[in-house]
């Protein structure tokens, strides 16, 4: 299903440029309000946001649209995305809205939507919303007496903190654990340091002073350099890197080595399997997860199920098949025993619990497998249909044959950025380099603009 406005993670774009404009955000609010008012009784909406400057603008526009449609809005302020999903259920809301562009720079923003169960809306629901956005809704709005209200809710960030803390086993405390947490100047800047401190850790928070324009700026899960320096400086046991909206996490061990999402999934899956907590004898990841993870899990008698890229597709597969551990190499870790979406803080707490239980340093705990050589490249393009051109399709077919059955090639258009993402992995590094370089040349040659990154 090709969608007009929604990508793999909601609606996203540059702030004050279509579709992230106040008038379009108001249309989204109206469309969502009209749809949910007709299907639910409470007419209650919760809205959270990260720390981007444009969040205020889009928040007000959404409120205008939602209240015009007769919805009552509860404004949570800056909270992590998983907090919106959790509070949507806790506050018995019909709808949850998160204003965020996740790990993107401050000048981008986006709108993510959650249903009353705390799960992101399905493709079908998003398609219905798109139809309503393009419809004249003037006759479908609330009457003067039924216009909705809006109010700010204080203290709900502490409900999320308590929720996150409860995911840690009751017999586990973090006393004497030295932790550096990089909050990415984002939505988790209050919740993450506070939760870790309340659990007994010695906490060194960095990038916890958002100003509207410094979110994800040389910090967080997309840039670990300052976190690694701080871990080394204070001799920390572990560094935790969150992204702008707090739904993904990467770890830095005491040696300042990076631990990606695949390794974190391996740690949790192995630990939960030993404890009898791992359901369905396996995990769900995406086509981008390293082949080394699959080999590691298979060696433990566990399965690995792959989905399209995007944590929503991981969650969908987990729900359909009953798995309780899933995620992406980028750090989206979904643990359905606790929540309905990726949660960086909760995932980090599970890793810390594994560290305390094993009594091993993070470097020993988290290097569970040797990653298969993998090359990731982005090609900035103007026309995403370039992959449908026959010369490009032919080149991809030839590349797959050259790599053989023991390697993998993934080429896809990004759902959030104007780029083609190429991933090749296999045991022969030189072959991977050659194949990827040749494919990049073919793609750029057949696109109307050439710009590789």
Curated annotation (Swiss-Prot):
GO terms for biological process: carbohydrate metabolic process; peptidoglycan biosynthetic process; UDP-N-acetylglucosamine biosynthetic process. Its EC number is 5.4.2.10. The active site is at residue 102. Pfam families: PGM_PMM_I (PF02878), PGM_PMM_II (PF02879), PGM_PMM_III (PF02880), PGM_PMM_IV (PF00408). The modification Phosphoserine is found at residue 102. Binds 1 Mg(2+) ion per subunit. GO terms for molecular function: magnesium ion binding; phosphoglucosamine mutase activity; phosphomannomutase activity. GO terms for cellular component: cytosol. The keyword Transport does not apply. Keywords: Isomerase, Magnesium, Metal-binding, Phosphoprotein. It is an enzyme of class 5 (isomerase). Mg(2+) binds at residues 102, 243, 245, 247. Its cofactor is Mg(2+). It catalyses: alpha-D-glucosamine 1-phosphate = D-glucosamine 6-phosphate. HAMAP family: GlmM_B. Catalyzes the conversion of glucosamine-6-phosphate to glucosamine-1-phosphate. This is Phosphoglucosamine mutase. It comes from Bartonella tribocorum (strain CIP 105476 / IBS 506). The lineage of its organism: Bacteria, Pseudomonadati, Pseudomonadota, Alphaproteobacteria, Hyphomicrobiales.
